[in-house]
Amino acid sequence: MKEEEVSFFSEGERISAILRLPDGSPPGSWPAIVQGPGWLGLKDAKLYLPYHEALTAAGYSVLIFDYRGFGESEGDRGVILPQLQLEDLTNAVTYLTTREDVDADNIGVFGSGGTGGGNAILLAASDDRIRVAVSQVPVADGEDWLHRMRREYEWQEFLDRLENDRRERVVTGTGEM
């Protein structure tokens, strides 16, 4: 497996990425998989290497990147918004289509973890260029997931905090959350 550090732009922010390629010469071009990391994950996390090694051994190129605001990518630090992550994934797909060593008609998405798996589903549903999607351990219902992480009294306290924060933001423009 060969690695190439690359970057592309997403809504004006430079996105840092790693393109992992199969060894050898492509048969014209490689089919590709794009992966946005899971919850707070980064492109160089060792967790993803076994997947990428298997995919490149099977003849796929793999693009993994740091979402904007994370790792080496530009953007507001630590902002986690699914719609921004979806834009980054969509722009990652567009970047792949610009490469001569990638088969632009054979691009898939792989996502692992709550946000990674959920974002893979969102991308596949919204981008006709995606031919296949693998979503491993997604959060499909965020409210249910947040609820199950708490005891009932903690859930009620959390809902009260959300409502108080909403009210504060409406009046002052800022809030806790």
Model-predicted regions and their roles:
Residues 54-72:
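Conserved alpha/beta-hydrolase
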Residues 91-172:
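Primarily recognizes the serine-hydrolase "nucleophile elbow" in alpha/beta-hydrolase
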Residues 38, 67-70, 112-114, 138:
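Short, ordered loop/turn segments at secondary-structure junctions
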Residues 38-53, 67:
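The serine-hydrolase catalytic nucleophile loop
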Residues 28-38:
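Short beta-strand element of the alpha/beta-hydrolase
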Residues 43-45, 70-108:
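Catalytic nucleophile-loop/oxyanion-hole region of alpha/beta-hydrolase
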Residues 1-28:
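N-terminal cap/lid segment of alpha/beta-hydrolase-fold proteins
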